Amino acid sequence: MLKNDLWINQKASEGMIQPFQSNLVRHLEPDNKQKPVLSYGCSSYGYDLRLSSKEFLIFRHIPGTVMNPKNFNPNNLEKTVLHHDSDGDFFILPAHSYGLGVALEKMKVPENITVICIGKSTYARLGIIVNTTPAEAGWEGHLTLEFSNSSGADCRIYAEEGICQLLFFEGDPCSTTYEDRRGKYQNQPEKVTLAKI
């Protein structure tokens, strides 16, 4: 069953999401409609995460190399600059490229919940695809977030603002949680965690 805002708020008070915003924020200053932000916080049946400003990496082409998920070469990634102007802080994701960021919020997924991460409509309409995998029962940490820019234009990816939406699905209790099996991505810090086996 998909969980609602009442459940999300209750579980957040028990530490499921930190820091937590109990309502959907669309303006940093509620009285100043001139300064909108990409919404974040609790919505009717989900939670909009923010992108951390701490790190954003972009894949680069190194002639003659092939990426290997069993032996990932971090040299295939390059750090990007955090830019700032009157619209806010942002990274640039080049056209037809792939980037990795990290969620500002830390999560602690309950043992009977699986979390699915999907894109936000504002970014989707610019060709940005969120390709983040599920957060399983018992997983804890900062999600590493994956993005593809499928458009032919560079795109701003705003930091400290909404980047994707989490959906919380409740299931029957499982016999082994992600924490029980000592999953390799458990307790990810607020930095990009690279592929590992």
Which ranges hold each PLM region?
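DUTPase catalytic domain/fold
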Residues: 1-197
